[in-house]
Amino acid sequence: MQFDVVATNPPFQDSTNKKKTQHKLWIEFTQRAFDQWLKPEGMLLQVSPNSFLSPSNKILKLMQQKDVKYLRLDTERYFPKVGSTFADYLIYNRSSDKKTEIIVNDNTFEQTLDSTIFYLPNDISKESLEIHKKTIFNITNKLNVKYDYVTCHNTLIHRNDFISRTKTENHIHPIFHTNAQVWYSRVRQDWSNKKKVMWSRSGYTKPFYDDCVYGGTDMVYYVLVADDTSGYNLANNLNTKLMKYIFKTAKWSGFGNEKLFCSLPDLPTDRAMSDSQMYELFNLTKEEEVYVENYVG
């Protein structure tokens, strides 16, 4: 049986089989609404967590494929005693190239939700989306960001003695983990001996130049550079207010995201840029510059 309308606030997770279920029930429920329950042209009216803003989220991908009439992202105001964030939305079971009405804190604007917008910034507004378009979404030349998720994965610290939180006779090779933690490894990663700009996806994103000192855990991302000058310049440019804004507003659950990092623009390494030069490089309007300045502080 299929329906013209499904109106729901689906269960968040399986409270009975928590240990057996690795997915969130509300996501599966939403997918089934379109795969099984709704007629063609039928509509889903739903309240759910707003955790679908991040890259690769299944619900955001679904929205990109359907006709989203409206998307309200401040729904938690109606649930003041619930410590979570919510959204509500109306989605038709059909494809569409029409714009979606997005509502946040009494501000309303229209935006096409297509595959070029592979995440929604956590300060979503008309201004923020324009800034992310100019800096991330519409960029073709990207930084060559690298990572190593295998050699020194942080879970190894619980499984064997391959890595250690402290330096020992066997663990002599420093590996960058988070802004506050440097661990040590029994082996030297081949890229450790190369000049690079690196950062952790945990906590604040603070790129810095490393002159062949550190390796890294699976938390770490890096960009190889030709020399010291290039390294210091790139680190400077990645720490300008515009990039700090991008890192801050494209972060979910306290962590940066691989897809964002691998979509960073190929910034100059031949010079250290000022904030105003960075704004000019990406053609930000004066209003957008003020928005970034006010947000970053």
Name every feature range the model reports, one short phrase each:
Residues 2-9:
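Short SAM/SAH-binding signature in class I
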Residues 4, 14-77, 88-91, 234:
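Conserved Class I SAM-dependent methyltransferase catalytic core
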Residues 9, 13, 36, 257, ...:
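Mid-sequence acidic-hydrophobic segments that form the walls
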Residues 9, 48-51, 202-203:
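A short beta-strand-to-loop transition that corresponds to the Sensor-1 phosphate-sensing loop
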Residues 10-11, 49, 265, 281:
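Proline-rich low-complexity regions
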Residues 13-14, 52, 97, 205:
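Glycine-rich nucleotide phosphate-binding loop and flanking beta-alpha elements
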Residues 76-291, 296:
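C-terminal substrate-recognition regions of SAM-dependent nucleic acid methyltransferases
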